[in-house]
Swiss-Prot record:
Main subcellular location of this protein, as a coarse class: cytoplasm
Residues modified to N6-carboxylysine: K218
UniProt subunit comment: Heterotrimer of UreA (gamma), UreB (beta) and UreC (alpha) subunits. Three heterotrimers associate to form the active enzyme.
Protein name: Urease subunit alpha
InterPro entries, per the entry: Amidohydro-rel (IPR006680), Metal-dep_hydrolase_composite (IPR011059), Metal_Hydrolase (IPR032466), Urease_alpha_N_dom (IPR011612), Urease_alpha_subunit (IPR050112), Urease_AS (IPR017950), Urease_asu (IPR005848), Urease_asu_c (IPR017951)
Length: 568
């Protein structure tokens, strides 16, 4: 006997299925489920009178043969697709994406449930990979709480606290600071990787930072990003398989953008602030988007272009870069970096996939908890202003959604050599997962899973008789406590440092994972974000032309994912 359910009834019971569409928060973005891995009539669901019970959806298999945790009937949104599936977690890693249940009595089971299996109900929820923010100024450790609660599970950058150098640059300079920061990383339930200071014209000061545990090096104009420093830094990176991030020369003191590109010599580099106002060669840093060896990112303060963007930026810039508004040269420096035309073009370059990544620039002009929000606000603004992307139709925005989710998940992972561990929802990867109610997508996660264990969740009054009574807010869960913390989060280091035995020497508790493949990744590898246009920026008007087309758009006066979500 079969029972026919309406699509609405089915979605309310088991979540959306193939052909169903989901609105992302209060945006104009719609995603459509492309495939359902579960079988109609054989879905598993936990609860009184439901399927996952002994002898029904739960098998007699031992712990070795079943998942540790199954997220049931979830909609996965990732760069590779938008599908409905059960997600299996085993030993802190994603074990399978498919159909869960009892293989003794159910057909098509690819994930066995047993007495050793915990269940997280994913019905009606969207699951994304944990976000990766690659532009972190480690000014205050409390940033980590904000980032984790927003859905970011990996932070890469540099710093030592609220030192003047860290306020402006993402560098953890020298072996002593590197050791201290790696020791501090043991206390936080998030994946961390640190960049050393790359501004030197001889190799030894850079190599010793890589040996001390840096996953890469950061070149910043405030420390002197000259062609000689760039060349030396990239040479060391090539020798150690680490990445270089660069904030280029806003004042064009040591050369124009062409001189910087020439110093790259075709070698892979992650260009921070490839944007309209964040810094770097004024006014034409955007030109590097067209280089095959350049992996470009921008930061969230200009995302997206709104009627308030310009006014906000001047004061931010003066504080972050230790400038004095009473000094004419400092004021001119600040004003040269804030250009409405290039900010507007930045929106479009993100939408067309020329800008491959988006990050925060935390407490140094950017907001650490708003990477994900501002990514999707940009996607919404571009859909409203520019319409559907090629590859999307009238029914959904699937391609645009895949393009934008890749900007803060898989592409940063590929860039910094950590994609073998994080950055996507794929079997074998570390189980860093973010669960969202669709109405709150991109704004307020329902739950953050770190290394297979719940780290942060919206939780009600701990003294209540059930979990839901007010006040409901984000609270740290058991993955953030005791020895579980070190077993559910990773610290990324160089292979050189791992071989040197820094784990034992520094007394580290977290698992150290070496970065790899940093020197072979190119713009072509940036998933859904690999466009290499020929860009020209008019030095007088700042108009941006890409492959012959003028890139311009109006500032937004109203945005979704904003005030209505933050009344309390």
């Amino acid at each position: 006997m079969t029972l026919r359910l309406s699509r609405r009834a089915y979605a309310e019971m088991f979540g959306p299925t193939t052909g169903d569409r989901i609105r992302l928060a209060d945006t104009e973005l719609l995603i459509e489920v492309e495939r359902d891995h579960t079988l109609y009539g054989e879905e598993v669901k936990f609860g009184g009178g439901k399927v996952i019970r002994d002898g029904m959806g739960q098998s007699q298999l031992p712990a070795a043969d079943v998942a540790d945790t199954v997220i049931t009937n979830a909609v996965i949104l990732d760069h590779w697709g938008i599908v409905k599936a059960d997600i299996a977690i085993k030993h802190g890693r994603i074990a399978a994406i498919g159909k869960a249940g009892n293989p003794d009595i159910q057909p098509g089971v690819t994930i066995a449930i047993g007495a050793a299996t915990e269940i997280i109900a994913g019905e009606g929820l969207i699951v994304t990979a944990g976000g990766i923010d690659t532009h972190i100024h480690f000014i205050s450790p409390q940033q980590i709480d904000e980032a984790l609660a927003s859905g970011v599970t990996t932070m890469i950058g540099g710093g030592t606290g609220p030192a003047t150098g860290t306020n402006a640059t993402t560098c953890t300079p020298g072996p002593w600071h590197m050791e201290r920061m790696l020791q501090a990383a043991d206390g936080w339930p998030i994946n961390l990787g640190f960049l050393g200071k790359g501004n030197a014209s001889r190799p030894q000061p850079l190599v010793e930072q890589i040996e001390a545990g840096a996953i890469g090096l950061k070149l910043h104009e405030d420390w002197g990003t000259t062609p000689a420093a760039i060349d030396n830094c990239l040479t060391v990176a090539d020798d150690t398989d680490t990445q270089v991030a660069i904030h280029t020369d806003t004042l064009n003191e040591a050369g124009f953008v062409e001189a910087t590109v020439a110093a790259f010599k075709g070698r892979t580099i992650h260009t921070y602030h490839t944007e309209g106002a964040g810094g770097g060669h004024a006014p034409d840093i955007l030109k590097v988007c067209g280089e095959a060896n350049v992996l470009p990112s921008s930061t969230n303060p200009t995302r997206p272009y709104t009627i308030n963007t310009l006014d906000e930026h001047l004061d931010m810039l003066m504080v972050c870069h230790h400038l004095d508004p009473s000094i004419a040269e400092d004021l001119a420096f600040a004003e040269s970096r804030i250009r409405r035309e290039t900010i507007a073009a930045e929106d479009i370059l993100h939408d067309l996939g020329a800008l491959s990544m988006l990050s925060s620039d935390s407490q140094a002009m950017g907001r650490v908890g708003e990477v994900i929000i501002r990514t999707w606000q940009t996607a919404h603004k571009m859909k409203v202003q520019r319409g559907a992307l090629t590859g999307d139709g009238a029914r959904n925005d699937n391609f645009r959604a895949k393009r934008y989710v890749a900007k803060y998940t898989i592409n940063p992972a590929l860039t910094h050599g950590i994609a073998h561990e994080v950055g996507s929802i794929e079997p074998g990867k570390w189980a860093d997962l973010v669960l969202w109610e669709p109405a709150f997508f991109g704004v307020k996660p329902a739950m953050i899973v770190k290394g297979g264990m719940i780290a942060v969740a919206q939780m009600g009054d701990p003294n209540a008789s059930i979990p839901t009574p007010q006040p409901v807010h984000y609270r740290e869960m058991f993955a953030t406590r005791g020895g579980a913390l070190a077993r559910t989060s990773l610290t990324f280091v160089s292979q050189l440092a791992l071989d040197a035995g820094i784990s034992a020497r520094y007394g580290l508790a977290k698992r150290l994972v070496p970065v790899r493949g940093c020197r072979t990744v190119t713009k072509r590898d940036m998933i859904h974000n690999a466009w290499q246009p020929a860009i020209r920026v008019d030095p007088e008007t700042y108009d941006v032309v890409a492959d012959g087309a003028l890139l311009t758009c109006e500032p937004a006066a109203v945005l979704p994912m904003a005030q209505r979500y933050f009344l309390f």
